[in-house]
């Protein structure tokens, strides 16, 4: 009888999935820092996650809906794993971060299914994909509910491409020593294959499906294709952890582009966003014969990885993301920061050496994670470098103008 009761307890359906903020068990040594950044958004004292309405709106999410979802999470009077943080509701139910964003995505998915006009329906599917992606944010390894939301995002993203005026090719790439990964190749309506192509190197807290706006508004009008893959330990790259060889996955993809008929492998550039710049700049040194240029936005290549005063500005969630990607979920802050030092491209002996690959770097004044000196280091290391200063205000139009400049620069390098 006791055995039967034990089995009943063990196998009884449970709605208490692991809650996101509990997945990284770092021995924290400080009160979480505050951060206000254009690319990361803001830390708010009563939220675990950094709230990034600017970038979410840039991706296509209505700011009114963002506030509505955040309000539903904020008013939930149910069990939290940490009573200080509004977004730590236990279980998949009302008030839970993942539940509320998925719920909003489902509304858009239903509208997409009911829509007769293909262009409108495609946009509705994209809306759904964006909400599902935010549901999984910050995409920590082992977050079961987030992984389900990410699968929904991928499916909605693929459905959108069937209705909108571009082609999406799902490509599989072999990776030496382990599991293959899947990438999305976005082909523009303008021009003919093989296309000049931008290899996207995203930030550590985003999915490869989060960069559609970059393709639609900045690359496709120039007849440029975009190839995305997930960063290590996220999405289809789930089985790979981030190592000091940060460009490992992207480099293997780059070497296989000769086999992709839609890509002009002799006209390829890389675009690095935040930590993705670490990947892109590393590729500039390791694969100069395969890249026409590298563009970076708010790069993280040295200072944040080595400087203790800069690391003091890094909030818990961002450190959790780094620890999760590196497979160091149980490490202390001290051990994690010692390891981060080896991820610096200057420490590795790359940055500071002359690089033949053209490199562009854009920075914001007073960016706590990527100061001007970071971008200057990249530009001065290239034999053909260009520096872009991005005004802090007006935020949205400055971001837009910077992306326009960068897309024109990449187009010019791929002539």
Curated annotation (Swiss-Prot):
Residue ranges the record marks as coiled coil: none
Keyword Hydrolase: yes
InterPro entries tied to this protein: AB_hydrolase_fold, FrsA, FrsA-like, FrsA_esterase
Highest rank taxon of the organism: Bacteria
A Pfam family this chain is assigned to: FrsA-like
Enzyme class: hydrolase
Keywords, comma-separated and alphabetical: Hydrolase, Serine esterase
Family indicated by similarity: Belongs to the FrsA family.
Cited PANTHER family: DIENELACTONE HYDROLASE DOMAIN-CONTAINING PROTEIN-RELATED, ESTERASE FRSA
Protein name per Swiss-Prot or TrEMBL: Esterase FrsA
Protein source organism: Serratia proteamaculans (strain 568)
Name of the gene: frsA
């Amino acid at each position: 009888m006791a055995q039967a009761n034990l089995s009943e307890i063990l196998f009884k359906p449970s709605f208490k999935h692991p809650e996101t903020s509990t997945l990284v068990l770092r021995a924290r040594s400080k009160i979480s820092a505050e951060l206000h950044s254009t690319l990361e958004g803001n830390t708010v004292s009563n939220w675990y996650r950094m709230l990034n309405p600017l970038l979410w709106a840039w991706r296509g999410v209505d700011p009114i809906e963002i506030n509505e979802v955040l309000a539903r999470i904020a008013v939930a009077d149910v069990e939290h794993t940490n009573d200080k943080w509004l977004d730590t509701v236990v279980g998949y139910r009302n008030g839970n971060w993942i539940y509320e964003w998925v719920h909003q995505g489902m509304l858009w998915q239903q509208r997409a299914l009911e829509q007769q006009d293909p262009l409108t329906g495609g946009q509705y599917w994209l809306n759904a994909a964006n909400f599902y992606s935010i549901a999984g944010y910050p995409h920590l390894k082992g977050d079961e509910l987030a992984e389900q939301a990410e699968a929904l995002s991928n499916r909605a993203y693929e459905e959108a491409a069937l209705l909108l005026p571009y082609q999406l090719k799902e490509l599989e790439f072999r990776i030496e020593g382990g599991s293959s990964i899947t990438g999305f190749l976005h082909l523009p309506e303008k021009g003919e294959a093989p296309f000049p192509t931008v290899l996207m190197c995203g930030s550590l807290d985003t999915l490869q499906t989060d960069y559609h706006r970059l393709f639609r508004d900045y690359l496709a009008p120039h007849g440029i294709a975009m190839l995305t893959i997930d960063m290590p330990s996220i999405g289809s790259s789930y089985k790979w952890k981030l190592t000091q060889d940060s460009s490992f996955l992207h480099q293997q993809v780059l070497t296989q582009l000769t086999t992709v008929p839609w890509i002009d492998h002799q006209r390829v550039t890389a675009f690095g966003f935040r930590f993705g710049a670490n990947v892109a700049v590393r590729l500039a040194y390791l694969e100069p014969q395969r890249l026409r240029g590298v563009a970076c936005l708010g790069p993280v290549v040295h200072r944040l990885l080595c400087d203790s005063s800069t690391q003091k500005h890094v909030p818990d969630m961002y450190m959790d993301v780094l620890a999760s990607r590196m497979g160091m979920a149980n490490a202390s802050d001290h051990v994690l920061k010692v390891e981060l030092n080896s991820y610096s491209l200057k420490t590795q002996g790359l940055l500071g050496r002359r690089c033949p690959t053209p490199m562009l770097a854009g920075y914001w004044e007073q960016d706590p994670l990527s100061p001007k000196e970071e971008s200057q280091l990249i530009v001065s290391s290239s034999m053909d470098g260009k520096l872009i200063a991005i005004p802090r205000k007006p935020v949205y139009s400055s971001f837009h103008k910077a992306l326009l400049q960068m897309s024109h620069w990449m187009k010019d390098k791929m002539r």
